[in-house]
From Swiss-Prot:
Residues 368-387 are annotated as: RCL. The reactive center loop (RCL) extends out from the body of the protein and directs binding to the target protease. The protease cleaves the serpin at the reactive site within the RCL, establishing a covalent linkage between the serpin reactive site and the active site of the protease. The resulting inactive serpin-protease complex is highly stable. GO terms for molecular function: serine-type endopeptidase inhibitor activity. Residues 1-24 form the signal peptide. The keyword Flavoprotein does not apply. Glycans are attached at residues 65, 102, 165, 266. This is Alpha-1-antitrypsin-like protein CM55-MM. GO terms for cellular component: extracellular space. It is found in: Secreted. Its main location: secreted. Belongs to the serpin family. The record marks 377-378 as: Reactive bond.
Amino acid sequence: MPSSISWGLLLLAALSCLGPGSLAQDAQETEASKKDQEHPASHRIAPHLAEFALSLYRVLAHQSNTTNIFFSPVSIATALAMLSLGTKGDTHTQILEGLDFNLTEMAEADIHQGFQNLLQTLNRPNTQLQLTSGNGLFIHQNLKLLDKFLEDVKSLYHSEALPTNFTNTEEARQQINSYVEKGTQGKIVELVKELHRDTVLALVNYIFFKGKWEEPFNEEDTKEEDFHVDEATTVRVPMMNRLGMFHLHHCSTLASWVLQMDYLGNATAIFLLPDKGKMQHLEDTVTMEILSKFLKNRETTLVDLYFPKVSISGTYDLKTVLHSLGITRVFSQEADLSGVTEDAPLTVSKALHKAVLDIHEKGTDAAGATFLEMIPMMLPPDMKFDRPFLVVIYEHHTKSPLFVGKVVNPTLQ
């Protein structure tokens, strides 16, 4: 049996249509689950996900300050936690500690129950906010997985076990790509470019998101305007515009403007526009604790807002990034994945992640409804997001950052 495991995290986040996922059909209303709704297990892991998200962001930002950044910390963490079920020793400890968990303070069972609850919550049908996540376990036809690992990834992470002929790398590549393409309604195609011939197992995770603004922009008000990438570079972008009441505050601690824009449903986009020359300060200073204070402050102010249409993506080989967070052994010959299979020693050869973000005017689908907003009779201040800014998409039920990114140049896909 080949002695290599190729692990792919293939993830998608996009403001595009997708129907509700299948996990919600498995979540049954029991007395215990009703009781847990007040203090769900996902809330216990939320602070750790937030810390992991910002740590991962800082590593990516340190690699380059001239490129867009966009990723889903929830999806990456979910895939790593799922993989940890089959690891032992230092390999096991590194993964969970890299996710900001301290096993002396939180039982491992609570960690996995937290992710189980997180996935059930995110995949619950919602007529306003469309969000789903999927996990696929592609297994070499001749590889015998341990029953406990297979049972745990199915019950806790709702992973599909899919027999795969990895001896035919092209056939296996097409099978994985078809799974991702179907799960993302055609948004991502040909994501896996090549597979190593020694691959025996691939973990594939995707997340898909479509949000509708509570208060959409009018397409007729969108005009081409300048966006200042840096002091030497200016690009023309479609700039959306809306006069109205916004959750907008200036934070002296972050030296940034903080704008919250709600989606219909249970999610909010937080945009952080640093004062000129203060991007590095913002990146070094921002914490989820600070952002949580703004999420609780729902005061509004009258603003004439200008915001660029955005269509960006982030594609990452996570191996180097995770090394910076102390997750190294799983990628080495010393990796202990003996909880996955006893057939052969395994190591993770590849960890891929892709996320896509689209921001546009459409807050709702066309419908016979009218929205009237009352605004004071005064000259409002302008607020232009015409230079690089950060974005965090936050889900309220799970208290988790679904996506984190930086828009440096809205015209670069």
